[in-house]
Amino acid sequence: MSIKNPSVKFIIFVLMICTFSIGYTEYAVMGILTSIANDFHIQVSSAGLLVTAYAASVCLTGPLVTIISVKLPRKPVLLGLMAIFILSNLMSALAPNFAVLAISRILSASIHGAFFAIAMVFASEMVPPEKRAAAAASMNGGLTVALMLGVPFGSYLGDVLNWRAVFSIITALGVIGFLGLMAAVPNRKPKVIPMLMNEWGVFKHKQVLFSFAITILGYSGVFIAYTFIEPILRHSAGFSTVGITGALFAYGLGGVAGNFFAGKVPLPLLTRTMIGVMIGLIGVLAVFPYIAIYPAAAIVATFLFGACAFGTPPLLQTKVISSSEGGTTIAAAVSVSAFNLANALGAWIGGMILNGTGSYSWLFAGGALMTACGLVLSTFAHLSEKKSVYEYQVNKG
């Protein structure tokens, strides 16, 4: 990142620690489901409800908390959100039963969307316009690192120690982030207060509605399978702790590659590229259970799964913003909620499939089917979209 001001760089680094911690607590559960299920003597499918609860909470509370806090000074809001994050993850680490753990996950998720929205705007306000993309990319790097490193090593620690150790580490990271915010972040009101009531017209745009529907249907297919990726790899490939860690790292590495690729796609090719990525995702889901019985093939398949899964969100989010024509604030907020609704829906459907069939293979069949529904909608969107919107955006840029 080419931001030269040392104080600004340190503030963004602190925000990265916070976003890493929040991303870590979101994804880490998927790597320790077996450990949690064994500790509380419940089915793995029941433990998967933790993923559903978290995603549903983000979906419902993110836009609401953001709107409530949008007129307040950034620093106390960020500190308050991180304080809730710390307490909720400490509650997770000490949870005496599954119900308390589920409640703590819902509480932790309640700050997720608001923190990201406020921190993103705050980071962009600290730098000149030409540096805003670099600032946002650096801050969001926390999520990428959480996916690539935090999840696999969280799974490893969960096996070597226990799942409570993972939440203890997340709590400690939250404390570090909180202290960093106290020391580095200036206390000032937002420069621009969005007029959210003027942005509801975004829902009149057909392509925006298409994008939300594609997100909910298509991306839920990812989480039908990914929610249970850790027990799937144990069962199919026979992986031990080290194998699970390597496979989850491969998924994260694939996610980084897919995200990077998606960021390079020109605006006029958004929907067409999205269709191609979704076809690839369906293909990976369809063959995964058949090739994952071979350890080396399982690693490769997991990498491709991550690449296709994380190649989709940037395309959808860019499509939403490009099609919103002035309602980008509410469009972006609802887009985040749509992804988390897909997360919750996928985890719930996956749990039902696992309970009903007792087979991990059917999870991938269900995931491929849901993604195929998203593919059909993407095709309709491509046939009906106005190319002039993207041509305008390109010429404007």
UniProtKB/Swiss-Prot annotation:
GO terms for cellular component: plasma membrane. Pfam families: MFS_1. Keywords: Cell membrane, Membrane, Transmembrane, Transmembrane helix, Transport. It is found in: Cell membrane. It is a multi-pass membrane protein. The chain crosses the membrane at residues 10-30, 48-68, 76-96, 106-126, 141-161, 165-185, 209-229, 242-262, 274-294, 296-316, 334-354, 363-383. Gene3D superfamilies: MFS general substrate transporter like domains (1.20.1250.20). The keyword 4Fe-4S does not apply. The keyword Transmembrane helix applies. Its main location: membrane. GO terms for molecular function: transmembrane transporter activity. GO terms for biological process: transmembrane transport. PANTHER family: CHLORAMPHENICOL EFFLUX PUMP RV0191 (PTHR43124:SF3), PURINE EFFLUX PUMP PBUE (PTHR43124). Belongs to the major facilitator superfamily. This is Uncharacterized MFS-type transporter YfhI.
